[in-house]
């Protein structure tokens, strides 16, 4: 196995800028900005605009549009009497 070709996998804190929610996970992404976590250790901080805490799909605030099927659109367009 070649040495020094693998990315540095480390614990980092991701912060949702919309809600302020933070979570600690492992990542190869680095950051110059750091934050002190609940365990007293300092980790790199990565800010994200959307996470599972703010995304409508995960929060249950997603709105579904009624999608007509192909037959329904055909009947609507050409009229079924």
Swiss-Prot record:
Coiled coil segments of this chain: none
UniProt GO molecular function: structural constituent of ribosome
Any one of the GO BP annotations: translation
Keyword terms of this UniProt record: Ribonucleoprotein, Ribosomal protein
Any one of the GO CC terms: ribonucleoprotein complex
Gene3D superfamilies, sorted: Ribosomal protein L31
Keyword Cell wall biogenesis/degradation part of the UniProt annotation: no
Family matches, as InterPro entries: Ribosomal_bL28/bL31-like_sf, Ribosomal_bL31, Ribosomal_bL31_B, Ribosomal_bL31_sf
This protein's record includes keyword Lipid metabolism: no
UniProt-listed PANTHER family: 50S RIBOSOMAL PROTEIN L31, CHLOROPLASTIC, LARGE RIBOSOMAL SUBUNIT PROTEIN BL31C
Family stated for the protein in its record: Belongs to the bacterial ribosomal protein bL31 family. Type B subfamily.
Subunit structure: Part of the 50S ribosomal subunit.
Protein name: Large ribosomal subunit protein bL31B
Organism of origin: Lactococcus lactis subsp. cremoris (strain MG1363)
Gene: rpmE2
């Amino acid at each position: 196995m070649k040495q020094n070709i693998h990315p540095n996998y480390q614990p980092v804190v991701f912060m949702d800028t919309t809600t302020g929610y933070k979570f600690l996970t492992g990542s190869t992404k680095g950051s110059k900005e750091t934050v002190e976590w609940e365990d007293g250790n300092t980790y790199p901080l990565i800010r994200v605009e959307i996470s599972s805490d703010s995304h409508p799909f995960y929060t249950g605030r997603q709105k579904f549009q009624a999608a007509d099927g192909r037959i329904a659109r055909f009947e609507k367009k050409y009229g079924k009497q």
